[in-house]
Each structure stands twice: as C-alpha cells, then as structure tokens.
C-alpha cells in the first residue's frame, strides 16, 4: 500500500489522563488506522514531536525547522506522504514547505494528507472530491493507483 508516515503530533494523544485512548510513548492507533485503510505505516523519528504549533506566528523560523525535522525523518524512512489529524499541523507541514525547501536544500518536498482524505479514498470517494487542489505540495498523483489504498479482508 501507499507508504504513509503517521503524525500524531503533540496533541492527538495528550493529555493522557483525560484521553487515555493509546499509549502516549508508543502509540499504535494511527498506525492501525493507516493499515485499516490499506496504507503501509512508516515508522520514523519525531512522529510525536511538536510541528511548531502556534509559534508559527511569533517564531516562524522555529516552526519551519521543527516541521522540516519531522518531514525529513519521514521521507528518509521511505514515506510517500505524511498523514495528520490537526489543521495547524497541516498548515505548518504543507503550507510551509516553500520556506522549508528554501532553508533546507536537501529537502525536495513531501505531500501532507489529512487522515480523512485517506479514509474517504479507501471508502471509494473519487480523488477529485478529496480537496487535493488545496495542498501546497501536490498529492493527487498518490491517488492514481487505487490498489495502493484498497482495503483487503
């Protein structure tokens, strides 16, 4: 299947006491989700590190650096894309990629997807309905081969 790096970030599983839906230090819920929609989860460093969150307003360079570390680690481990749950994570990792590529010449770019786009694709929604045209990093080619995300019993 499509090799996707799950990005839990700093908020999906925290605070643990209130949420308690997965092990915060070794989460599996996002990996399990990706497998259930036919993707191959990619393990990588920094998958639970903060992407820069709200400091993207006051310290954009710090958010650019944080997002670069996450994206580059995912890419170096073979990810074709990274999946997020948070709109701010999407902004920092997708919309900031022009700044990331400018600051880090070794980074060619990596598509960023919402987990809901992968779910919709797996459920048979046409790629033209996934909102991919809103992405700063083109992602539509990832959805050309339906077999990459087919759910197999």
Whereabouts are the PLM-identified features?
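Iron-sulfur cluster-binding electron-transfer modules in prokaryotic oxidoreductases
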Residues: 1-153
């Amino acid at each position: 299947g499509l090799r996707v790096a799950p990005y839990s970030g700093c908020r999906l599983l925290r605070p643990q006491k209130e949420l308690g839906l997965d092990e915060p230090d070794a989460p599996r819920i996002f990996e399990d989700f990706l497998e259930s929609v036919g993707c191959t989860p990619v393990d990588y460093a920094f998958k639970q590190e903060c992407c820069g969150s709200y400091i993207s307003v006051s310290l954009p360079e710090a958010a650019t650096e944080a997002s670069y570390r996450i994206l580059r680690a995912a890419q170096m481990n073979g990810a074709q894309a990274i999946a997020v749950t948070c709109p701010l994570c999407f902004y920092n990792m997708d919309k900031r990629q022009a700044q990331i590529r400018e600051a880090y010449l070794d980074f060619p770019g990596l598509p960023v997807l919402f987990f809901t786009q992968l779910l919709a694709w797996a459920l048979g929604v046409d790629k033209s309905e996934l909102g991919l045209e809103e992405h700063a990093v083109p992602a539509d080619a990832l959805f050309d081969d339906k077999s990459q995300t087919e759910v197999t019993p």
